[in-house]
Amino acid sequence: MHAVNTLTGRPTEPVLIAGAWRTAATVSSFRAVDPTTGQEREQLWPVSSWSDVDAALDAAGATAAELARLPGERIAVFLERYAERLAARGQELVAVSHAETGLAIEPRLANVELPRTLNQLRQAAAAAREGTWRMAMIDSARNIRSAAFGLGPVIVFPPANFPLAYGALTGGDFAAAIAAGNPVIAKAHPGNPGVSRRQSHLP
């Protein structure tokens, strides 16, 4: 389901930029739609202005060089610990995902999508640790050396129907970007913004 845009009221949800929650520079707001009833939900969510977008891009750009220098082991440990925290809150994340998307708790979310999500993060951790994704090559005859590196900030736009496995903060795109040393700008899907909100508040 798509969210419904509205200019009535003021959203209370903040945005997370450069590691800090702040009031959104709102140009409009929206309410997600309950997929089981077709009715708007009560919670108002902000639609950020270009100033928020620019701030997120600036923060990600400033972080890119630092993240690119991190050893693969440190990135791997982060991804593994993140997967552990997601697993610990799995039941809660599944419940929110079900409420916002209407997808079945079992077997779809709890038995298929959540395990897949955790596995993706752990596979990304293994790739970061091994470094094989760099595909380093040395051509001694031509004195050419090559290797893959992170590209810089990556923006993840999640779909409506995979709130966890393709989520902006948990999905395969997120995991691959982090494993390769890229900072991520995550945009919540307007149909299930509460899922991303919950993912961003892991203890």
Language model segments and positions:
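Conserved small-residue-rich beta-alpha loop and adjacent elements
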Residues: R134-P203
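N-terminal Rossmann-like NAD(P)+-binding subdomain of aldehyde/semialdehyde dehydrogenases
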Residues: M1-A141
